[in-house]
Amino acid sequence: MAKLRVSYEYTEAEDKSIRLGLFLIVSGILSLFIFGFCWLSPALQDLQATAANCTVLSVQQIGEVFECTFTCGTDCRGTSQYPCVQVYVNNSESNSRALLHSDQHQLLTNPKCSYIPPCKRENQKNSESVMNWQQYWKDEIGSQPFTCYFNQHQRPEDVLLQRTHDEIVLLHCFLWPVVAFVVGVLIVVLTICAKSLAVKAEAMKKRKFS
């Protein structure tokens, strides 16, 4: 009996399906590394902070100014200055004095100041924004307790007014790369299995009529 020969070559559609699957697999792996580096690390640091009660001890400008970058159009950028205000609070978790910051981003941008205003071209507008923020903490908050966030292990001398990340960020960091990876694997596996079944069916058909 002559040896049966069955073609294992993929059709153009099958080849495109496998390439799409491999692309999704690679994209999922790369996305996981990119999201992990850009989002996961700061999000985990932010979520490690525990809620505490804080009360204001002092609000003052320290006489230093810092630069910020403003934009005034597509190709227009520049720098201006803003005064540094410090709000020291008593942290109920450690019962110690700590410097208040608006959020994790501002803490990393300027750990010396409590507030970074939206950067404007005119220094005067930046100063007014800082003054309004300073007066708010002096007059409206005063000695009233408020919720702050404290990380004993990372920065025990600082507290945050609000978190910039939550569990949703962690979910997205893992969910979409994993979905892309799983879909890619399924496409490749199903395409190969479908081809294998088609080849076996063709071989059985040839044996039947040989």
Curated annotation (Swiss-Prot):
Task: Quote the subunit structure annotation.
Answer: Interacts with KCNMA1 tetramer. There are probably 4 molecules of KCMNB4 per KCNMA1 tetramer. Interacts with FMR1 (via N-terminus).
Q: Which organism is it from?
A: Rattus norvegicus (Rat)
| Residue ranges, Extracellular side | 41-167
Q: What does this protein do?
A: Regulatory subunit of the calcium activated potassium KCNMA1 (maxiK) channel. Modulates the calcium sensitivity and gating kinetics of KCNMA1, thereby contributing to KCNMA1 channel diversity. Decreases the gating kinetics and calcium sensitivity of the KCNMA1 channel, but with fast deactivation kinetics. May decrease KCNMA1 channel openings at low calcium concentrations but increases channel openings at high calcium concentrations. Makes KCNMA1 channel resistant to 100 nM charybdotoxin (CTX) toxin concentrations.
> GO CC annotations?
plasma membrane; voltage-gated potassium channel complex
Q: Transport as a keyword? A: yes
Glycosylation site positions? 53, 90
**Is Protease one of the keywords?**
no
- Which regions face the Cytoplasmic side of the membrane? 1-19, 189-210
Q: Name the membrane topology term.
A: Multi-pass membrane protein
Q: Lineage of the source organism?
A: Eukaryota, Metazoa, Chordata, Craniata, Vertebrata
Report TM segments: 20-40, 168-188
Domain statement: Resistance to charybdotoxin (CTX) toxin is mediated by the extracellular domain.
Q: What is this protein called?
A: Calcium-activated potassium channel subunit beta-4
